[in-house]
């Protein structure tokens, strides 16, 4: 949290998989998230692990920690005399838990550009590119290890980590800022906290 706040971001966007376990098990571990600070707010979209960890029970915890969870919805933020749309979608495992799956069209309907979409799984970019300016995703852990890139790409729409483009839309797939307990190792794929600087067209 200290490293993130030291960057002095205007807004903080979290692309899912924030927890592994129920609030009863992880509330103490999650407590430092309340220290995140950004003038425009802290926003998140759910990843698959939020659903495995009882997302309905986590929603009030996220709110209490100052994190706005966007589930097929958007926030239109005033920025320097203009607007910025920040949207988030649910994950495609939601249906297994009787919850709505990702619906980027609903999330973005009626919102102004520029639009940033948080979608935990990057393959949604194939569908969303015409409607957005930037998509931020995770899920792949950056491939975990360099030699796993091809396999990770196969199961994630061809995306592994870094920048991708389709026409005027851009996708960034982040490797995440920590480790996953199921494979607590990184080989040549360091974790990161990404600082993006958005510039208006001249």
Model-predicted regions and their roles:
Residues 1-202:
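Soluble catalytic domains of enzymes that build or remodel membrane lipids, polysaccharides, and related
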């Amino acid at each position: 949290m200290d490293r993130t706040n030291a960057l002095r971001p205007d807004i903080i966007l979290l692309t899912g998989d924030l927890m592994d376990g129920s609030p009863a098990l992880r509330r103490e571990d999650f407590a430092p998230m309340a220290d995140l600070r950004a003038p425009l707010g802290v926003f998140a979209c759910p990843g698959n692990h939020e659903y495995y960890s009882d997302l309905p029970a986590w929603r009030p915890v996220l709110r209490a920690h100052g994190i706005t969870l966007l589930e097929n919805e958007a926030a239109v933020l005033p920025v320097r005399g203009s607007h910025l749309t920040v949207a988030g979608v649910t994950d495609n495992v939601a249906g297994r838990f009787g919850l709505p799956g990702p619906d980027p069209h609903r999330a973005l309907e009626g919102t102004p550009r520029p639009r940033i979409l948080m979608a935990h799984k990057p393959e949604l970019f194939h569908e969303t590119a015409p409607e957005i300016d930037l998509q931020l995703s995770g899920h792949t852990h950056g491939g975990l290890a360099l030699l796993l890139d091809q396999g990770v790409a196969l199961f994630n729409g061809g995306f592994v980590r870094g920048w991708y483009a389709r026409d005027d839309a851009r996708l960034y797939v982040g490797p995440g800022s920590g480790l996953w307990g199921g494979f607590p190792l990184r080989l040549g794929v360091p974790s990161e906290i990404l600082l993006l600087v958005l510039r208006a067209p001249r």
